[in-house]
Amino acid sequence: MALEEVVRYLGPHNEIPLTLTRDSETGHFLLKHFLPILQQYHDTGNINETNPDSFPTDEERNKLLAHYGIAVNTDDRGELWIELEKCLQLLNMLNLFGLFQDAFEFEEPETDQDEEDPSHSKLPENKTKSENSKDNISSKRINNLQDMSLDSDAHRELGSPLKKLKIDTSVIDAESDSTPNTARGKPNDDINKGPSGDNENNGTDDNDRTAGPIITFTHDLTSDFLSSPLKIMKALPSPVVNDNEQKMKLEAFLQRLLFPEIQEMPTSLNNDSSNRNSEGGSSNQQQQHVSFDSLLQEVNDAFPNTQLNLNIPVDEHGNTPLHWLTSIANLELVKHLVKHGSNRLYGDNMGESCLVKAVKSVNNYDSGTFEALLDYLYPCLILEDSMNRTILHHIIITSGMTGCSAAAKYYLDILMGWIVKKQNRPIQSGTNEKESKPNDKNGERKDSILENLDLKWIIANMLNAQDSNGDTCLNIAARLGNISIVDALLDYGADPFIANKSGLRPVDFGAGTSKLQNTNGGDENSKMVSKGDYDGQKNGKAKKIRSQLLKNPPETTSLINDVQNLLNSISKDYENETVQYNEKLEKLHKELNEQREELANSREQLANVKQLKDEYSLMQEQLTNLKAGIEEEEESFREESKKLGIIADESSGIDWDSSEYDADEPFKVEFLSDFLEDKLQKNYEGDISKLLEAESKEQIMEQIRNQLPAEKIQSMLPPTVLLKARINAYKRNDKHLTNVLDTISTKQSELENKFRRVLSLCLKIDENKVDNMLDGLLQAISSEDPQDIDTDEMQDFLKKHAS
């Protein structure tokens, strides 16, 4: 950043330094050095006694900026900078232009001879008279902010992009073109008036500057709104449009309208614009108006079979284009939309009208467009949302938002001032064309809303209106603690004794107690109603409340006692509820423990069932295996029977019951076995070898035949097939046993050879000598205790026998 600094000295002895610092890149001048001189000039009108080190506070600085219409830019370090034009205006106002003219090569500014107020802006020579007039009007609008006693802290916190207090001059031109002679006055024109509406400046009527007609549009006003008596009504529900063609057409129109720099404008439109610029006789507003109509025609050409519906919601909250444009303070487009049929009575999903959107943001406060906005959106004043909240409710709620206190006070004062001033303004009937024409000989239109919407109706129907919670606007303001708005509402006649559904009243929060005690009944500053329509001193209800409070001021002792009783009651209720909840908690804990026990039992039963299921599955598997084994054994038995010569037909009648037939029983015939057993015991002492040596088989068989008849022997013998099976089985078993014996003998021989080999290796002798030495070795080992064996003697023994 390249800075240029020039120091000059003021005062009769040149003892007051004044430094001008300019940023050569942007051309802006540092504001800090102007502030001490401006403060001294504002307080005394003389700068010769300025203390250059005495800087005003933030609040005083903001008042100076508002009073002199200074727009500032803030850099990254927080320093405030002003533009070249404003620097020249301030230097000329302070008669310091000549000191710095040569240093910065300033051009001599042209002074407006008709301007008497030093706070009004003065422009350089290169400004035209038209531009000078516009800036003067803008400066007046900005200067009015200081007169309203705005909250400077809240004003500094406003988050609007218009915070620099720059006024769009095209809006002012649009006002003068569409509504002749409607130059807007100060936002607080009515604040400076007495209760009867008279101006305090020696009877001068400030309404002369705002005497332009109010142009009415009735395309959206039904008979309910135009009929008498006037009453508060619900906003129309947000429309539901399912036609995608209409949505696409509206979207295309809004894109071309709001973002013209990214749209390709038709050649004809550009040519028309160039022709108008070349003529030099049309204003910025006229160019915008033609652009609006041209864009409208362009969209109609693009969608010839689809009607342009300006009331389609553009977001999920049900906001129409009119809602959005009022919230961003685009007055020019609001006027065009109303002229072309946009419905002002539609609410969003919460029933909030477009005027509510205007007061819920600070944009209309920053740009000073709220008063002009009321000329087009006045039907919204009698609307309430889904929670029965009027426009006054929403203004008060806005005052509780961070940085919006000053804006809310501005909206309230402008609204009440517009209500009073509109009674003296003519009314014209507007159409959806470019011009509006009066509908009677006096150029006025009899509109029931404008006829009946006076301050008396506002006080009677809206000031003390309650929302769905029973809150009046005064109740909300008292709870928020906004003293300036509370005092204003009380001056208008708001009732501080109306309780909401919770039983709370504004007076419970101190609303009106201190103010009314210090207010005289004849104080002219407390009167807020015009003389022609309503006298605030004759308001019976407000007068009764005021006199009641003055005669019987509230006792703080009783209030403290009531609060103490309320706290005690709340504490007792809390203790009772705590006991109840503790009992419920204990009961729940008990039930929880029971449920836990039941759950544990259920889990145990489930584990047992799972175990039984596993055992059952195991037994099922074992049973299946047994059945399979039995089947295999039966198959094997059948194969073995075939090998033994047992035919299935022959063995079908045999009883194979294990109780009568033992598969392991020796192959014997019972009577033969008994005969041989008896013979062995009697004759051979049980030695069968002696029997076989003494007698042959034929002799034994002959003896049996002699003892028993052949029929009995035949009956006692098993079936032939069984005998054959036994014989074959015996032979097979004998063969099997012989094979087993041979196998064992072979294994034994191999084992003996291994042991013989081991001994030969241990004794270091030949294998063929091991057998001869085994007896002596065994005797030597077994005759001694293993612990007492003399290994040397054993070695001698082995050597002796080895030789």
UniProtKB/Swiss-Prot annotation:
- What is the protein's given name? Regulatory protein SWI6
Phosphoserine: residues carrying this PTM: 149, 160, 176, 547
Q: Gene behind this chain?
A: SWI6
Under InterPro entries, the record lists: Ankyrin_rpt, Ankyrin_rpt-contain_sf, SWI6-like, Swi6_N
Annotated localization: Nucleus; Cytoplasm
According to the record, the residues making up region (Disordered) are: 108-150, 169-212, 266-288, 512-540
Compositionally biased spans, kind Polar residues: 139-149, 514-523
Q: Where is the composition biased (Acidic residues)?
A: 108-117
**Subunit text:** Component of the transcription complex MCB-binding factor (MBF) composed of SWI6 and MBP1. Component of the transcription complex SCB-binding factor (SBF) composed of SWI6 and SWI4. Interacts with MSA1 and STB1.
The modified positions for Phosphothreonine read: 179, 182
Ranges that cross the membrane: none
GO cellular component terms, semicolon-separated:
cytoplasm; MBF transcription complex; nucleus; SBF transcription complex
Protein role: Part of a complex involved in cell-cycle-dependent transcription. SWI4 and SWI6 are required for formation of the cell-cycle box factor-DNA complex. The repeated element in the upstream region of HO (5'-CACGAAAA-3') is called the cell cycle box (CCB).
What's a single GO MF annotation on this record? DNA-binding transcription activator activity, RNA polymerase II-specific
* Modifications the protein undergoes after translation, according to the UniProt entry: Phosphorylated by CDC28 and dephosphorylated by CDC14.
List compositional bias (Low complexity) regions by residue number.
Answer: 270-288
User: Which Gene Ontology terms describe the biological processes this protein takes part in?
Assistant: cellular response to heat; G1/S transition of mitotic cell cycle; positive regulation of reciprocal meiotic recombination; positive regulation of transcription by RNA polymerase II; regulation of DNA-templated transcription
Entry keywords, A to Z: Activator, ANK repeat, Cytoplasm, DNA-binding, Nucleus, Phosphoprotein, Repeat, Transcription, Transcription regulation
Compositionally biased region (Basic and acidic residues):
118-138, 524-538
The residues bearing each ANK repeat, given as ranges, are 318-346, 347-383, 384-469, 470-498, 499-514
